[in-house]
């Protein structure tokens, strides 16, 4: 697994590097700050990002947000800060696993595994949400097109839907595509 490490403490970075290498991981980058993190993530394409910090600062969390939006991947944060608000901020920013007190070499791999599992679950939920939102928007568009057909052709809802389906089949298009065309045509005519 390709891992990027962000840690301003050279001693901890060495411990982390040794733990990761012993587990068979490739360290693609070791950086002291999160300053250029979004750019480096795009360039180096790590599978996982590990951030070791005394306490996550605003800049680090903002960079995590950018990564989570533009190039999502599991992010593990080791920190000495056990403030519950800081933990919530980090998780909201996109941290998959926030670990307080303990960069023990034996714990690194299980923590990475948890972060990956949590990240994959969250990505699946986001995908489901996106699909549901798209489906709802499509239904609204189809209903609107149906309403236009009902009004224009003076037919009932069932007949308008049948005509929409027939147009889609005749043109070898999806129902939503036909509905969008009807709405566009209606805008032009009005």
Region spans (language model):
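A short, hydrophobic beta-strand element within the central beta-sheet of small alpha/beta folds
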Residues: 73-82
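Conserved acidic segment of CheY-like receiver
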Residues: 1-11, 16-20, 49
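Conserved phosphotransfer microenvironments
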Residues: 33-37, 47-67
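C-terminal output/effector regions of signal-responsive regulators
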Residues: 127-190
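C-terminal output helix
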Residues: 85, 103-112
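Short hydrophobic/Thr-rich beta-strand motif most characteristic of the beta2 strand and flanking loop
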Residues: 24-33
